[in-house]
Amino acid sequence: MTTRKYFGTDGIRGRVGQFPITPEFMLKLGWAAGMAFRKMGACRILVGKDTRISGYMFESALEAGLSAAGADVLLLGPMPTPAIAYLTRTFHAEAGIVISASHNPHYDNGIKFFSGQGTKLPDEIEMMIEELLDAPMTVAESENLGKVSRINDAAGRYIEFCKSSVPTSTDFAGLKVVIDCAHGATYKVAPNVFRELGAQVVVLSAQPDGLNINKNCGSTHMEALQAAVVAEHADMGIGFDGDGDRVLMVDHTGTIVDGDELLYIIARDLHERGRLQGGVVGTLMSNLGLELALAEQSIPFVRANVGDRYVIAELLERNWQIGGENSGHIVCFQHATTGDAIIASLQVILALRRSGISLAEARLKLRKCPQILINVRFAGSGVDPVSHPSVQQACARVTEQMAGRGRVLLRKSGTEPLVRVMVEGEDETQVRSYAEELAKLVAEVCA
């Protein structure tokens, strides 16, 4: 298998100003992508972004590179990542480019691509782009340069798409919901989707200034949303991340409902209505309780590697519809081609309205096993802590001691310099002790 030089598990991501997240690299990346897609014929490429300040700089650089390669460019402005996937497909473009670092702070940014079908870019095209990145840059003749235009009604198109996932006979009258937009890409569209469906909406963190994206808000910092739901006597809260591809929710008591629980609510509703195609795809990090609860409903469950691209690949291979991660990436293939936070939250609300129960009651139908996750910073000392013999021996010993009633998982993050240590089992005190023991050992090996 060819080793990627630039692309990670979810595109290219890093600190702004540090290679490869620089204007110079983005110019070359735009050109390389344009050349790769031009090999398939004339092409149009959509470009969208989240709200971080560096997005404007990188948008200009990509636009110039794409045009230099002879590719036409359609600029969407700040839009959720799944909206860019949807619009790439409906505009019959050859590709879509997202400028975003998702849930990361404002000082990070990144690039990911969608194919013309609104799916993650095939590996062979990524490799073609990588090869072109190392080639000398050329510029098309003036008459062949790409044209650049802006799509002014992109938000309205996506709002209507989201609403189309809700039956026309259904509205959200009587529902009070608090939405936290993380000062990110959903800040315009999400409140309007829920308002137009009839809900009473209280909006948090929808004043982006380029620097406040994900800052103490959104799906990675749920405290303000939890407090607001209780203070407003709302039925629920919905927390999006900065680019709108992951969602967590809060029930009326202020309790967080994570991705595993949301996935179970959607899957159970589909199963009870005879609409579930196949089973459910989770990840190595999915709670054991999800697997057991689905088994009680005779719903098949498989685990993919961590990352929504692996969940999507597993769904495609099995021709299943529903998958996701406990972090809140939820894929509903019956409606969208990628993880879509707004679509997922709408499907949860529809499931609750059909069943006549609250989010708090639905959450309790999934009995989660205690799961402790500790992130250990990995500075890249040259030693792989995950495969280190002493770490492997300790993991084997802990697994044996749990006697089939728990799991141990160590993995390196695909987007950050972290080793994630996860231990799961029936006894929380025991699980925490094991996790802390393993995390300490990993830290020592990393040092």
Swiss-Prot record:
GO terms for molecular function: magnesium ion binding; phosphoglucosamine mutase activity; phosphomannomutase activity. GO terms for biological process: carbohydrate metabolic process; peptidoglycan biosynthetic process; UDP-N-acetylglucosamine biosynthetic process. Binds 1 Mg(2+) ion per subunit. Activated by phosphorylation. Its EC number is 5.4.2.10. The active site is at S102 (phosphoserine intermediate). Keywords: Isomerase, Magnesium, Metal-binding, Phosphoprotein. The modification Phosphoserine is found at S102. Catalyzes the conversion of glucosamine-6-phosphate to glucosamine-1-phosphate. NCBIfam families: glmM (TIGR01455), PRK10887.1 (NF008139). Belongs to the phosphohexose mutase family. This is Phosphoglucosamine mutase. It comes from Pseudomonas savastanoi pv. phaseolicola (strain 1448A / Race 6) (Pseudomonas syringae pv. phaseolicola (strain 1448A / Race 6)).
